[in-house]
């Protein structure tokens, strides 16, 4: 198993290289130049040329990419073009804030979706099931940006129950204050995942309820509760680990919008600011960090799935043995 984990980890390296290549060339080919921020109308052609040389923009794009990779491997992500601060300083604390928000949204989505999905699956065709199915379509269709604005208008500006933006109120670092700031961003960020998880759990529950082992348990006089918690739930919820890894992408994309609307000091807001300012080094850092979060999240999901299901673990080891022959 250890050898498999090492091999899986090594497989992530080509993915990171491809993402960095694609991102760098897309950013480089975008209209404008990073040097535009430093060039003024009063500069001579020679001074403008010197700006390009100082920024390494006089070299070809492949040479610029290799120079960037060399710096990254040395732990130097460069400087922000807008603030002139080291990018490591710019992202300090922001990754943790984004992970906190995404983690809270993910846990909230599971806490809501799993019991609701199980009930819908057990009571297929009931009024509750039909209502929830309709609601999931609404959750998936509602634009996150619009919902965020509506929540701010209602709960912050009209009712005054929740703060409009930020992570903490002025001179208040309490956990309660943090939770108040998280409520609306978490709701917006988790809504689509709640709908997706409900549909997935419901579908799996219905499928499991039609299996022979359920009919056997019913014939032996087992109650619905015993069947659900003793047999159906485990088989229903196990595949959700894989789905959870796949849904990380929606959280990363969602955080980009949610953090910008609610002023949450995380990577998403930093990425939006970097794009608005055409801060290319910071955009590159945001892209790579987002990619790493996705890759690591999916890697952890694979490991958890293998640990939870012995059959998957066995197939992984078999694949590894065949690959080594």
Q: For each of these PLM feature ranges, what is it?
A:
Residues 2-3, 95-128, 144, 173-325:
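Alpha-helical transmembrane segments of integral membrane proteins
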Residues 6-16:
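N-terminal signal-anchor/signal peptide hydrophobic helix marking the start
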Residues 12, 94, 98, 134-137, ...:
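Residue-level signal for discrete positions within transmembrane alpha-helices
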Residues 15-66, 159-178:
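Hydrophobic alpha-helical transmembrane segments of membrane transport/permease proteins
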Residues 23-29, 70, 134-165, 188-192:
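Membrane-water interface segments at the C-terminal ends of transmembrane alpha-helices
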Residues 43-75, 183, 262-273:
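Short hydrophobic, aromatic-rich alpha-helical segments embedded in or entering the lipid bilayer
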Residues 53-61, 78-87, 169-182, 275-281:
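Membrane-interfacial helix-loop-helix junctions in multi-pass membrane proteins
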Residues 58-114:
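An internal, D/E-rich "acidic patch" concept
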